[in-house]
Regions:
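Helix-turn-helix
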Residues: 13, 17, 25-59, 63
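Amphipathic, non-transmembrane alpha-helical scaffold segments
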Residues: 11, 15, 61, 65, ...
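N-terminal intrinsically disordered/low-complexity leader segments
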Residues: 1-13
Length: 192
């Protein structure tokens, strides 16, 4: 493993600072109301420095989803303790609920708009992890093989996003983890 140079560490710190400031402003004002200039000012960097790390404001937005995928790859995929398909899917979406709760209701409300196409971007790590669980469930005859693993994965995410949207509608005054568990449990029972 190569050791990072001081310059590389500084560059990573600068990129993270821009990211954190951008997320803070997006959380507060919404994606469309925040400018690159505001993010740069908040981060204490020039606009040119911003564009060195992110080609556009949308690149920073994409980074939010990239980091969510990295979290699921590094902390969720290999740490699911459940054994059956049903239990694994419920546990996966419990972690998904936890992740949204940790982002905070205001940030999640800003992300959950019909203009945000990141949720339907194909091939994301989060989707691949769930699809692997679905494929194992199909291989073990725990769930239907009538639908493709991709279709089932998509349906489960559509359902989970609906639960999170409901949480947003109630301004976080809903037990997201309990609602997610109840809804996903019913959904996976229907796949048997």
């Amino acid at each position: 493993m190569t050791k990072m140079t001081n310059r590389a560490k500084q560059a990573e710190a600068t990129k993270n600072k821009i990211y954190e400031c951008g997320v803070k402003l997006i959380r507060k004002h919404g994606f469309d109301q925040v400018t690159v200039e505001q993010i740069s000012k908040e981060a204490g960097v020039s606009v040119g420095t911003y564009y060195y790390y992110y080609q556009s404001k949308f690149d920073l937005f994409s980074e939010i989803f990239k980091r969510a995928d990295e979290y699921f790859l590094n902390h969720v995929a290999s740490n699911l303790s459940a054994k059956t398909f049903h239990e694994q899917v419920v546990e996966f979406f419990d972690k998904y609920a936890d992740f949204n709760i940790s982002d905070g209701i205001e940030m999640v409300k800003k992300l959950y708009t019909s203009d945000n196409k990141m949720f339907i971007t194909k091939g994301r790590a989060m989707q691949k992890i769930l699809q692997t669980i679905v494929e194992a469930g199909q291989s073990n005859y725990e769930i239907t093989g009538y639908l493709s693993s991709q279709d089932i994965t998509n349906m489960l995410f559509v359902t989970a996003r609906g639960v999170i949207y409901e949480w947003c509608l109630y301004d976080g005054n809903l037990d997201l983890k309990e609602e997610m568990k109840k809804t996903i449990t019913i959904m996976v029972k229907g796949l048997s």
